[in-house]
Curated annotation (Swiss-Prot):
GO cellular component: ribonucleoprotein complex; ribosome
Taxon lineage: Bacteria, Pseudomonadati, Pseudomonadota, Alphaproteobacteria, Rickettsiales
Gene for this chain: rpsH
Reported function: One of the primary rRNA binding proteins, it binds directly to 16S rRNA central domain where it helps coordinate assembly of the platform of the 30S subunit.
Region forming the signal peptide: none
Gene Ontology MF annotations: rRNA binding; structural constituent of ribosome
Keywords: Ribonucleoprotein, Ribosomal protein, RNA-binding, rRNA-binding
Similarity section: Belongs to the universal ribosomal protein uS8 family.
Protein name: Small ribosomal subunit protein uS8
Origin species: Rickettsia felis (strain ATCC VR-1525 / URRWXCal2)
Pfam families: Ribosomal_S8 (PF00410)
GO biological process, one term: translation
Oligomer and partners: Part of the 30S ribosomal subunit. Contacts proteins S5 and S12.
Length: 132
């Protein structure tokens, strides 16, 4: 069975893993997923991730991050732009998510980046997801 939205599947697996208090979560790998994980790692929402090969299929395993008292580092993670309804935004239209405590992840002509990095580079693009 083929999936229509691989990114939404990845975000759902991460969200469910945090709710279940898991240490790691794995899913099939792709370039866009790796780019999103780079942003999440750079912003401090996940510890690390590793891509491995099993039977000619590449999988990504993500090490989830928790605080000292066991709280998840991601409270909310939602898909914004979907295959049936793409959402694009100019950088001036992106306001801070949760009073700048959360981030939007954008796909821009310069690659996948957070809204903070997009503000610095003054570039807009497709809003992939929002994280808090």
């Amino acid at each position: 069975m083929s999936m229509t939205d691989n990114v939404a599947d990845m975000l759902t697996r991460i969200r469910n893993a945090y709710k279940s208090k898991l240490i790691n979560v794995s899913f099939p790998s792709s370039k866009i997923k790796t780019s999103i994980l780079d942003v999440l790692q750079k912003e401090g929402y996940i510890k690390d991730y590793v891509t491995t090969q099993k039977n000619n299929i590449s999988y990504t395993e993500v090490a989830l991050k928790y605080s000292v008292n066991g709280d998840a580092s991601i409270c909310e993670i939602h898909r914004v732009s979907k295959p049936g309804k793409r959402v694009y935004s100019a950088i001036k239209d992106l306001k801070g998510y949760y009073n700048n405590m959360g981030i939007y992840i954008l796909s821009t002509p310069y690659g996948v980046m957070s809204d903070r990095e997009a503000h610095i580079k003054n570039v807009g693009g497709e809003v992939i997801c929002k994280v808090f």
